[in-house]
Amino acid sequence: MLVPVVDMKLTGQNIASLRTQRGISVRDLQLMLGFTTPQSIYKWQRGETLPTIENLAALACILDVTIDAIVAVECRKTGK
């Protein structure tokens, strides 16, 4: 059986790459998302945490991509 697994590190790399490709600084993204500090963005980019679904939708709009372009999902086999 295959189960979907989010690759947090690759998702973070996608966020960082898409952000820099569009010339958006972490500070700019922080302001666009209404965050008081950039810590969450840095944690996303390092693959430590994932954005909430609301923040993921906002990122997709800001970066002008689909959510699929941000979130890296792989299917892994389970032992069943």
Label for each model-derived stretch:
Residues 1-5, 61, 69-80:
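Short, charged recognition helix plus adjacent turn
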Residues 1-22:
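A short, Lys/Arg-rich alpha-helix, primarily the initiator
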Residues 23-43:
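Short alpha-helical DNA-recognition segment
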Residues 20, 34, 46-48, 75:
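Residue-level detection of the helix-turn-helix DNA-binding "recognition helix"
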Residues 47-61, 77-79:
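Short, basic-rich loop-to-helix N-cap that marks the start of a DNA-contacting helix
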Residues 19, 30, 60:
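The alpha-helix within a helix-turn-helix
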Residues 16, 27, 57:
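Residues within the helices of the helix-turn-helix
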